[in-house]
Design a protein with these regions (language model features):
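Low-complexity, Ser/Thr/Pro/Gly-rich disordered linker/stalk regions
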Residues: 1-29, 33, 113, 159-171
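Beta-propeller-forming repeat regions
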Residues: 3-5, 90-95, 115, 123-124, ...
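Secretory/extracellular carbohydrate-interaction modules
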Residues: 9-79
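Beta-strand-rich interaction surfaces with strong enrichment in secreted/lumenal proteins
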Residues: 14-21, 91-97, 136
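Short tryptophan-centered beta-strand motifs in secreted/extracellular beta-sheet-rich domains
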Residues: 28-30, 100-110, 114-116
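Extracellular beta-strand elements of beta-rich domains used
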Residues: 107, 147-151
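Flexible glycan-contacting loops in extracellular carbohydrate-active proteins
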Residues: 125-148
Length: 603
């Protein structure tokens, strides 16, 4: 709109996208001017290229998979097929390019034929069927100008596009009929008015749940049951000026009495409150900064807080805290259930933003997967990934952003799956740290693992990307083979698993500005769309109904806490019910792993 030209590179390296993922046979053209002979990095997927590449992107499957017709430096025109970090040349011609004027680039996509023109003259027309449809746009990794960009389609292509959209909508509507839809069940009173956040907590019996409610100003926490009945309230000192960034409180049964206790940081102190009574059990000041992080002599920049079974049951849980900044952390402090110091460990390289805990060797004590280092309960380093003994190429690729650990293949062998920033997705042997697979999909950041595909053995790992290429989702089997890849939007890095039907296949809870908000199947289809309240709520899925392992939905909005459930019962004749065992190591949102389990239907 308006007058041009526009300098896309004022924003840095960019891919400007329009249309939708269903477009096939279109013509895209624009006048492009190459200004300078150096590029701008970091790049979405051209970081390893010194060349200046500016032009047209066609059939964009995601922001790292598309065709790219471009002016390259000042001496050639090239058509690339972009596949993550690979750029496959499909056509190229050497021709002088004039930096003082705009050149007309045109790409005509018809079936598997890609006809490319420069200044009205055909330069090559390769055949390639890798990408059959997708968005279209403008791509720039150097200072360039674009004028008169347009996309056209003939009548046949337009009618074909409408037919595909209509068929897709009918198929999706039919698919949605197979799934229960959410219906409002009841409202749960809040312990006190005003904004706040909710954390589920266990009370006594395995299926008895309540919640902690934290006031928006961080100065008050209440414990209540799911009827809204207040159990107790504690007043906190509130954040200190030098406190680290706010972190979620933890609900964990530290003392083993059946009630999840309250563990949090308040006014530069770690505090533990009894889940049964709300009484303060222990507190201690945060440690001073450890080596290589923070300011010496000042409070450590604490980022993470966990309760871990480092000693065999029935011993109480231990507490660990970790420092962190935007690039991860280096120090781990361990305390017992009375917050008495046990050990401190400086790790050899930075960990990321989510840890995992599992009894790897079968001795009844959990090991701690801190980034790419496995520690035992005494703080000993058992192994570290060989990959982390050098800095992988890329601006942000030297730590594990998030990890999951478990029997991913369903054969009893424990595996690590790690989203490792610019190094992509890694699969490793949890007993030795040997890397088994690597897949570079961009800056891999978010991860969950669950039975997303009913007929696949084990559980499936869903990885999502972030910096420089937001929103690509890749689903793997437990061995690390790709099962599906899609891009719901350009902001998300993952969702979380939801056991909605108890039939052995979990759905993905996702709030997407482009694809909608609700529950998606493993092929990226929105099969359970949310209504208005659920769309704007913080939604917490959890099995809350006795005898029904399906997740219900707690919807927290500024106005109320609402409980939503399925609009139909479990079908008659479904005698075995899927009831996965989940671990939420960081609150209940990040790095979730959902282990398969089946239970008999109650009589």
């Amino acid at each position: 709109e308006g007058e041009g030209p526009y300098l896309l590179s004022k924003l840095g390296d960019r891919l400007l996208i329009a249309g939708d993922r269903h477009w096939r046979d279109v013509t895209i053209r624009a006048r492009v001017r190459q200004f300078f002979s150096w590029n701008i990095s970091p790049s979405v997927n051209l970081s390893y290229r010194d060349a200046c590449l500016n032009g047209l992107a066609c059939r964009i499957r995601d922001v790292r998979s598309y065709y790219f017709l471009c002016l390259e430096d000042f001496d050639r025109v090239t058509l690339y097929r972009i596949e993550d970090d690979e750029q496959i040349v499909l056509g190229q011609v050497f021709v002088p390019l004039d930096r003082t004027r705009f050149h007309l680039l045109e790409a005509r996509c018809r079936g598997d034929r890609l006809t490319c023109l420069l200044d009205g003259r055909e330069v090559f027309a390769p055949v390639d069927a890798t990408y059959s449809s997708g968005w279209f746009g403008l791509r720039s990794n150097a200072k360039a100008g674009f004028l008169d960009a347009e996309v056209t389609a003939d009548e046949e292509a337009w009618q074909g596009h409408l037919a595909r959209l209509g068929a897709g909508e009918r198929q999706l509507a039919s698919l949605r009929e197979q799934y229960p839809q959410p219906v409002f069940q009841r409202q749960i009173p809040r312990p006190f008015e005003g904004p706040g956040s909710l954390q589920l907590r266990r009370v006594e019996a395995e299926d008895a749940w309540g919640f902690f409610w934290t006031a928006g100003d961080g100065r008050r926490v209440a414990a209540a049951d799911l009827e809204g009945q207040l159990r107790w309230t504690v007043d906190l000192e509130g954040p200190a000026p030098e406190d680290p960034a706010p972190i979620s409180l933890k609900a964990a049964d530290v003392d083993g009495d059946g009630h999840d206790d309250l563990l949090l940081i308040d006014h530069n102190k770690v505090k533990l409150f009894s889940g049964r009574t709300g009484e303060l059990v222990a507190e201690r000041p945060l440690p001073l900064s450890g080596p290589l992080m923070g300011v010496p002599g000042r409070t450590a920049p604490i980022g993470y807080l966990y309760a871990v079974r480092f000693r065999p049951a029935p011993a109480p849980l231990d507490i660990i805290i970790l420092d962190a900044d935007a690039g991860g952390g280096r120090n781990v402090w361990c305390y017992d259930h009375q917050l008495r110091p046990r050990w401190h460990r400086l790790l050899p390289f930075a960990f990321g933003h989510n840890m995992h805990f599992l009894d790897v060797d079968g001795d009844g004590r959990d090991e701690a997967m801190i980034g790419h280092c496995l520690l035992n309960g005494d703080g000993d380093l058992l192994w570290s990934l060989e990959e982390m003994h050098y800095a992988p190429h890329g601006a942000m690729g030297i730590h594990a952003d998030s990890v999951v650990l478990g029997d991913l293949e369903g054969n009893g062998a424990l595996r690590l799956a790690s989203v490792s920033g610019d190094d992509g997705v890694l699969f490793a042997d949890a007993a030795t740290g040997e890397i088994l697979r690597r897949d570079r999909i961009g800056h891999a950041q978010g991860i969950t693992a669950a039975r997303y595909v009913r007929d696949e053995p084990g559980i499936q790992v869903l990885a999502g990307t972030r910096h420089r290429a937001y929103g690509i989702f890749v689903l793997y089997n437990g061995k690390g083979d790709r099962l599906h890849r899609w891009q719901p939007d350009f902001v998300n890095q993952n969702g979380r698993p939801v056991n909605w039907t108890a039939d052995g296949e979990e759905l993905l809870l996702l709030s997407s500005p482009d694809s909608g908000t609700g529950l998606f199947d493993w092929r990226g289809r929105l099969v359970v769309p949310f209504g208005e309240e659920l769309r704007r709520a913080t939604v917490i899925p959890h099995p809350l109904a006795a005898g029904d392992p399906r997740d219900q939905l707690l919807a927290v909005t500024p106005e109320r806490i609402a409980l939503y459930t399925q609009d139909r019962p479990i079908p008659a004749g479904q005698e075995q019910l899927f009831s996965p065992v989940r671990h939420y190591w960081r609150g209940n949102t990040i790095g979730v792993i959902s282990h398969p389990r089946w239970v008999a239907r109650p009589a």
